[in-house]
Amino acid sequence: MKRHFGKWLTAAALAVGCTVMTANAFADTDGHWAESAINKWSGEYGIIQGYDDGTFRPDKTITRGAFAGILDRFLHFQNTSPANTFSDTVGTYWEDAILKLHASGIYLGNQGAALPSSTITRQQAVAMIGRAFRIAPETAAPDYTDTDQIAEYALAYVGEFEARGYLT
């Protein structure tokens, strides 16, 4: 699960920064295994973004805030953000995206904190994607060697994603 989902997550979602880059515009993706997906999702779709310095940093981890931004752009939320109930997002770059996803039941946070600067885990990403696309987890727990390390809230989503072939 770690290798395959990590590669997908990197290719489809690894991006932070403010500048939307066009296809083939990143200085550090030429020859990268995910170059084609990065170019498509950044240039053609405009969903993922690079850094202001013209790089994409395809092997860098992604934060919870950046992932929220990607989901927000993908889902095209039109609603305005509700009042902020998170103690750690006020004035941050990702505040609006996090609040819209939270109002939609996609981004849940943790004990009053959104943790936007924390690296997103695979199980957090799977649960957010599952909630975003209303994928009903109906499958038993997955059969991975590290299943005991998957949080209870994400276990059914991981099992469902495995059953559908999204995770291996």
Q: What residues fall within each predicted segment?
A:
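Feature responds to low-complexity, polar/acidic, surface-exposed segments characteristic
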Residues: K2-S36, I47-G65, L71-D96, A103-Q123, ...
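IQ-motif-like calmodulin-binding regions
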Residues: V126
